[in-house]
């Protein structure tokens, strides 16, 4: 386990040394990784940092409002409304890796726009060790690692937490006095709900995935999973009222893990499973069935794409 106080001082020194008297931007997603990296960078360089939250349209329910409230102490916070641009770029794309690359590239382009406006030279990211391992091992790319476009209009990228595991990031977040909603929050992928949708990302699938993930996080909070999620994985026949429907299949997944490198599917009681399926199928008329994923990692990854 990392020595938290020592790490914080070293990370702030690294950030300050790399960026010097120039300006930097950092992307905020609301997750613990990017939030902790932002807090570190803000302590290191203060107003030289512009925190950028890009509303991709791929975020969790209520995410944007939470960002506004949590980071209102940062005068430089910028919220970019980019939902239409992301959905336009993703239209028709079904390949998981291409989706990640499209999202990664669009993220960088959004950052570049803000960076030009504030005359920033550096990009700070919340990349952690498991991100690098999965990307280097070609398990899958991460939007802030393998998903980066080949040409980036920044002088450099600073990744102060690149050697930390998720539980160590949480320790750092607590030491920085970040709110519990940030430090204890379940992991959420950088590409957002796009990797919880098999195939093309559409507004209808996003609406289903967003509400289903909200239900799952609420219902499973007492189980204290390392990560819990819902994914739209395809279509199947169901019955609504007296009519047959060909509706969406939602897969629920809840795992225990220390660092995300390996994970075990949680055993959930029947009443909890039934309550989730009732809420999810009741929230959207086009959801035909809900299934529970019992696969560990390996052989599966935690996310579906």
Swiss-Prot record:
InterPro entries: GMP_synth_C (IPR001674), GMP_synthase_B (IPR026598), GMPS_ATP_PPase_dom (IPR025777), NAD/GMP_synthase (IPR022310), Rossmann-like_a/b/a_fold (IPR014729). Residues 2-185 form the GMPS ATP-PPase domain. It is an enzyme of class 6 (ligase). It holds the Pfam family NAD_synthase. Pathway: Purine metabolism; GMP biosynthesis; GMP from XMP (L-Gln route): step 1/1. One of its GO terms (cellular component) is cytosol. Keywords: ATP-binding, GMP biosynthesis, Ligase, Nucleotide-binding, Purine biosynthesis. PROSITE patterns: GMPS_ATP_PPASE (PS51553). Its EC number is 6.3.5.2. ATP binds at residues 29-35. It comes from the Archaea. Heterodimer composed of a glutamine amidotransferase subunit (A) and a GMP-binding subunit (B). This is GMP synthase [glutamine-hydrolyzing] subunit B. The gene is guaAB.
């Amino acid at each position: 386990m990392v020595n938290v106080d020592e790490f914080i001082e070293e990370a702030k020194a690294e950030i300050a040394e790399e960026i010097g008297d120039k300006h930097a931007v950092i992307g905020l997603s609301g997750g613990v990784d990017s939030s902790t990296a932002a807090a570190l960078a803000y302590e290191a360089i203060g107003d030289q940092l512009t925190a950028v939250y890009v509303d991709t349209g791929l975020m969790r329910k209520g995410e944007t409002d939470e960002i506004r409230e949590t980071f209102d102490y940062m005068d430089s916070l910028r919220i970019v409304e980019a939902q239409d641009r992301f959905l336009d770029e993703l239209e028709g794309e079904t390949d998981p890796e291409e989706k990640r690359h499209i999202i990664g590239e669009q993220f960088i382009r959004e950052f570049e726009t803000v960076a030009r406006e504030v005359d920033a030279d550096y990009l700070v990211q919340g990349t952690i060790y498991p991100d690098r391992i999965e990307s280097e091992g070609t398990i899958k790319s991460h939007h802030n690692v393998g998903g980066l476009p080949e040409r980036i209009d920044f002088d450099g990228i600073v990744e102060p937490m690149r050697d930390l595991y998720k539980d160590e990031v949480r320790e750092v977040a607590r030491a920085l006095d970040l709110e519990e909603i940030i430090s204890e929050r379940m992991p959420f992928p950088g590409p957002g709900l796009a990797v919880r949708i098999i195939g093309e990302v559409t507004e209808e699938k996003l609406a289903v995935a967003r509400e289903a993930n909200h239900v799952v996080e609420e219902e499973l909070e007492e189980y204290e999973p390392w990560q819990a999620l819902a994914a739209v994985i395809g279509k199947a026949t169901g019955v609504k009222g007296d009519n047959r429907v060909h509706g969406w299949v939602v897969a629920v997944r809840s795992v225990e893990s220390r660092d995300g490198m390996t994970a075990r599917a949680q055993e959930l009681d029947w009443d909890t499973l039934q309550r989730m399926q009732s809420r999810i199928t009741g929230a959207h008329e086009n959801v035909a069935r809900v299934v529970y994923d019992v696969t560990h990692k390996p052989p599966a990854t935690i996310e579906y794409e």
